[in-house]
Amino acid sequence: MVTHNAAFEISEYDRRIAKTRAAMSEAGLDALFVTDPSNQAWLTGYDGWSFYVHQGVILTMEGEPIWWGRHMDMMGGRRTCWMQHENIIGYGDHYVQSTQFHPMQDLAEHLKARGLARGR
């Protein structure tokens, strides 16, 4: 069982996701990557002061959204997001301030693993 401190009932998040997916379907999108902190909160309940690093919400046409961000911020996601903990994922600090690695490389691998390498 997931323990969360989300601001709204799950049914409200379900309503928001259904509304977003309807717009995605109309636009012909397979996935949406949401980076604005207020929109992340609107979809997932995520409430963290971590917007200074790469983070966002992956929303596909099925299943729970996935909060993706810095590994050290995952605990905040687990406390404030309504989703199952396996849908709160993080990237390592070796991506932060690196000249060799970029967090978007990690994001690309997660998208590819979900069959979205050629998604729209």
Predicted segments, located by residue:
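A composition/biophysics-driven feature that prefers long, compositionally simple stretches
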Residues: M1-R120
